[in-house]
Design a protein with these regions (language model features):
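A short, surface-exposed loop/turn module that caps and links secondary-structure elements
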Residues: 34-58
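Enriched for short, Lys/Arg-rich terminal
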Residues: 1-11, 15-19, 23-26, 30, ...
Length: 91
């Protein structure tokens, strides 16, 4: 039986989502739910990050980026940050 990954949001990611325009946050939430929640390979939709974000993955949704950590042992995708592409990597 193949494992399907569950999507979880950190407190910071939920704060980021609430700061965004309502229409943008709905698009991001819907995309994550459709493509990542319950999928068998969350790495297929994203790109691995390097340097100080090594071990993290990013998903491109329009001009916004979702930074995640994929935890294979717990079979979850933990959303860490959500933001505009011009500011998401400044943190």
């Amino acid at each position: 039986m193949k494992k399907s990954y569950k999507l979880e949001y950190s407190k910071g990611a939920l704060k980021d989502l609430l700061k965004l325009d309502n229409s943008v946050s709905r698009v991001i939430y819907a995309w994550m739910k459709k493509n990542i929640d319950g999928c068998e390979n969350p790495r297929a939709h994203g790109k691995g990050l390097a340097s100080n974000r090594s071990g993290q993955w990013r998903y491109r949704i329009g001009n916004y980026r979702v930074i995640c950590k994929i935890e294979d042992d717990r079979v979850i995708v933990l959303v860490l940050n959500i933001g505009h592409r011009s500011k998401i990597y400044d943190e």
